[in-house]
């Protein structure tokens, strides 16, 4: 008798995706981040659901409803901080996942990569609207500043901003719709993640060498299920340590002050995971130019498959490209630091140089290094 997991219509899908899936035998821990992102998404949806049961999306009660969750709801404080720090863990895993994809040439799977870029935009949108919900000072002013960027669009900009706001400023209508968006978007992310997996399983996984591994595959279960469980335990441990020992480490103290449209915080800045893009936005003195640079800083990822000039897929055997990759990582860390600093002399010029280097690395230096490496292979 054939095993039920191979014959049952639903079990067969699960079996082909997580049990009998042929997987390269040499994939490293950098391949753990996909499953960790799935875990993060589940944690966020569950904690978010319980928070939504007690939260009220109204300007007069939003801030106090979050306080109520932390003080009066059973284990409300841990649910709230798991959700807030879960977002940080989500982005850590996301950036590691993207970095590994870039390093090992996973962008050769065009469809999977492009769905990934769409997923990134959706996750960033979800995190942004979610940050507005506690209705603290940084929530309010962050929403005002970031939505206002759309007014830089010629002709329709102002109308578009007022349409998103649902009025002439960030107010009750804005908060209500942002809550609606924040509730629906994770389910869209879930659907997109399934599509992402479908496309990945069409081609099979890449591996660190970038060389086809069809002749050397092993079943996903038990080898990689065990490996994923180890990663999951480390993720949960880190998340719990952050939540229980330093819940406000990555947050902004200004968000513990209720939103006040009449008082602007000294330094308006987004959460840490958006600071690199915020630094690029601020480094251009022109509003429209800044908005375009901000958009391109993320959208540039969609062009990476076209910018791949190397004859090798992975960077494993390409020392020049490796060096430039780590320069890019250092550059992004520099931009993240600059994004959190005030707009004054030393920081502004460093931010501008780091922004130029970011685009220069991706558009010019890395493709040129790949061409040089191609020449060196003939020696």
Swiss-Prot record:
Binding annotation for a ubiquinone: 201
Annotated binding of heme b b562, by residue: 83, 182
A molecular function (GO) term: metal ion binding
Superkingdom of the source species: Eukaryota
Membrane topology, record value: Multi-pass membrane protein
Cofactor: how bound: Binds 2 heme b groups non-covalently.
Database matches in Pfam families: Cytochrom_B_C, Cytochrome_B
Cross-referenced InterPro entries: Cyt_b/b6_C, Cyt_b/b6_C_sf, Cyt_b/b6_N, Cytb/b6-like_sf, Cytochrome_b, Cytochrome_b_C_euk/bac, Cytochrome_b_N_euk/bac, Di-haem_cyt_TM
Known cofactor(s): heme b
Parts of the chain that traverse the membrane: 33-53, 77-98, 113-133, 178-198, 226-246, 288-308, 320-340, 347-367
Keywords associated with the record: Electron transport, Heme, Iron, Membrane, Metal-binding, Mitochondrion, Mitochondrion inner membrane, Respiratory chain, Transmembrane, Transmembrane helix, Transport, Ubiquinone
GO biological process, one term: mitochondrial electron transport, ubiquinol to cytochrome c
Keyword Coiled coil belongs to the record: no
Function: Component of the ubiquinol-cytochrome c reductase complex (complex III or cytochrome b-c1 complex) that is part of the mitochondrial respiratory chain. The b-c1 complex mediates electron transfer from ubiquinol to cytochrome c. Contributes to the generation of a proton gradient across the mitochondrial membrane that is then used for ATP synthesis.
Quaternary state and interactors: The cytochrome bc1 complex contains 11 subunits: 3 respiratory subunits (MT-CYB, CYC1 and UQCRFS1), 2 core proteins (UQCRC1 and UQCRC2) and 6 low-molecular weight proteins (UQCRH/QCR6, UQCRB/QCR7, UQCRQ/QCR8, UQCR10/QCR9, UQCR11/QCR10 and a cleavage product of UQCRFS1). This cytochrome bc1 complex then forms a dimer.
Note, other: Heme 1 (or BL or b562) is low-potential and absorbs at about 562 nm, and heme 2 (or BH or b566) is high-potential and absorbs at about 566 nm.
Name of the molecule in the record: Cytochrome b
